[in-house]
Design a protein with these regions (language model features):
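Short, functionally critical alpha-helical segments immediately adjacent to catalytic or ligand/cofactor-binding
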Residues: 130
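Bacterial Sec-dependent N-terminal signal peptides
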Residues: 1-24, 257
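N-terminal, motif-rich segments that launch catalysis or mediate targeting to/interaction with membranes
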Residues: 18-127, 136, 141-257
Length: 257
């Protein structure tokens, strides 16, 4: 965990808002997870993905958004429910949500009767959705669409609260996904990793939801965010990326055990 403190002290002065976690965040999660797969899980996943890495396929669920044929999967990326409540007590959407998505993907992958094509598709989705689960604004409020309607400035560029957490904070650190994943992975020992892998999807979602409440209270509409915001919250961003990677590995190892 000492690495997170070092990150704060080393934040660069150059930021980027080009990425649409965003791509980097999802790739970091996939890269970390790949390091902690069992031999059996790695073999099964390698076969399904034709040798491609988890980092490579981690953005697939966002890429298919441009195709109307996949429009029904859009609600699978998130869930919005009232702050201060638990997911299991909240009303559920008839169109599905991220929890239903993860359960569906898991069931398809565990089902011996699922086609190879279905398994490949749902594995790619699962890698992405476990990442989304750890981005707090994917567990935000309905009223502002998980922070998308809260307009802000990131340094001198227009943005919104959702994008700040999707990509602005990550891109601000200006590291490639492999480099960042390696640093985040090496800063956690085996005992800490096992602790972070405790719980289930419901626990992890409610944890993100609690962080969302803190994030909402951290800004005002139209506020200009910069160095001080990055200094205060990059630790949470990095921690969530770590958890996402370790927990993705746990989910995949359980599926392919």
């Amino acid at each position: 965990m000492r690495f997170l403190l070092i990150l704060f002290l080393a934040l660069p002065t150059i930021c980027s808002a080009n990425a649409i976690w965003g791509k980097t965040g999802h790739r970091v999660t996939g890269q970390i997870a790949e390091k902690h797969l069992t031999r059996k899980a790695k073999k099964a996943i390698n076969k399904l993905l034709d040798g491609h890495s988890l980092a490579f396929v981690s953005t697939y669920a966002d890429e298919i958004k441009s195709d109307r044929a996949y429009s029904s999967y859009s609600p699978w990326h998130y869930v919005n429910y009232a702050l201060g409540t638990r997911y299991q007590d909240a009303p559920k959407s008839e169109f599905g949500d991220i929890v239903m998505a993860i359960e569906t993907c898991t069931n398809v992958l565990k089902n011996p009767n699922s086609s190879q094509e279905d398994k490949i598709f749902h594995l790619k989705l699962l890698v992405h959705f476990i990442g989304d689960l750890h981005q707090p604004m994917h567990a935000g409020r309905s009223a502002d669409k998980g922070g998308n309607d809260i307009q802000l400035q990131w340094f001198d560029q227009g943005t919104n609260l959702h994008r700040v957490w999707d990509s602005n904070l990550i891109d601000y650190y200006n590291m490639g996904y492999v480099e960042l994943a390696n640093e985040l992975d090496r800063s956690i020992d085996k005992k800490e990793r096992k602790q972070l892998q405790q719980g289930d999807v419901y626990d992890w979602l409610d944890e993100s939801h609690e962080f969302a409440a803190t994030i909402y209270s951290s800004v005002e509409v139209g506020e200009k965010l910069g160095y001080s915001y990055a200094y205060e919250y990059n630790g949470l961003v990095f921690s969530q990326l770590q958890k996402g990677g370790f927990r993705l590995a746990k989910v995949l190892n359980d599926i392919f055990s």
